[in-house]
Swiss-Prot record:
Described purpose of this protein according to its UniProt entry: Catalyzes the oxidation of cyclohexanol to cyclohexanone. Required for the conversion of cyclohexanol to adipic acid.
Annotated organism of origin: Acinetobacter sp. (strain SE19)
Domain of life where this protein originates: Bacteria
Residues involved in NAD(+) binding: D42, N95, Y161, K165, I194, T196
This protein's name: Cyclohexanol dehydrogenase
């Protein structure tokens, strides 16, 4: 990460979940570089603090927060932490998630289904439920939800994940309509297979074949799209689904 070079976001405050690694981390670093005060939230506080230390060492503003996004009270506390630490909340990137069990629908356990829905869908609702009032109180802002290409198409053997991400897509659209005239823009980002810990267990060569571009995506490439959607450059963009997938879904 380069030293802080701009104040493009005019001293805005952002809450990012799942920010201890992968796309969330890359987005936290990029936003900090552009002058955003970032709450780096993750279920792994040590990982979150490492990201904060990196940001602060380079002249940015950040604070670590431990939160299990599947627990409503944790998200309430995360939003309160953002406001108490930096004075307001203007931006949110609801990014935390898990892949869950890889099994056919009949073999997917009930517990596995509930967990993947809770972490990937319910958690986004819990997050927005508490973020929206804070953002309204700050005079408006923007939210981006991570929904994956699995929120647009079917993928076998991860039915719970696919269902959850389709739910995030729908939730994003509904909320965008509710707050379009109230000063909050809400969009979703839909990455293909990105080189993050989420897909570390899979064979990379096989995943590369799924993308006509001939490679996997990098977290920084998704972060650039998220930063755009959170910025005033996207002032007329709300209720949209931004696909970052190397043409995966164009086949």
């Amino acid at each position: 990460m380069e030293k802080i070079m701009s104040n493009k976001f005019n001293n805005k405050v952002a809450l990012i979940t799942g920010a201890g690694s992968g796309i969330g981390k890359s987005t936290a670093l990029l936003l900090a570089q552009q002058g955003v005060s970032v709450v780096v939230s993750d279920i792994n506080l040590e990982a979150a603090q490492k990201v904060v230390d990196e940001i602060v060492a380079l002249g940015g503003k950040a604070a670590a927060n431990k939160a299990n996004t599947a627990e409503p009270e944790d998200m309430k506390a995360a939003v309160e932490f953002a406001v108490s630490t930096f004075g307001a909340l203007h931006l949110a990137f609801n990014n935390a998630g898990i892949l869950g069990e890889v099994n056919s629908t009949e073999e997917l356990s009930i517990e596995g289904w509930r967990r993947v829905i809770d972490v990937n869908l319910n958690a986004v609702f819990y997050s927005m439920h508490y973020e929206v009032p804070a953002i309204l109180a700050a005079g408006g802002g923007a939210i981006v939800n991570t929904a994956s290409i699995a929120g647009l198409i079917g993928i076998q053997n991860i039915s719970g994940y696919v269902a959850a991400k389709h739910g995030v897509t729908g939730l994003t659209k509904a909320a965008a309509l509710e707050y379009a005239d109230k000063g909050i823009r809400i969009n979703s980002v839909h990455p293909g297979y990105i080189k993050t810990p989420l897909i570390a267990e899979f064979e990379e060569a096989e995943m590369v074949k799924l993308h006509p571009i001939g490679r996997l995506g990098q977290p920084e490439e998704v972060a650039q799209v998220v930063a755009f959607l959170l910025s005033d450059d996207a002032s007329f963009v709300t209720g949209s689904q931004y696909v970052v997938d190397g043409a995966y879904t164009s086949k």
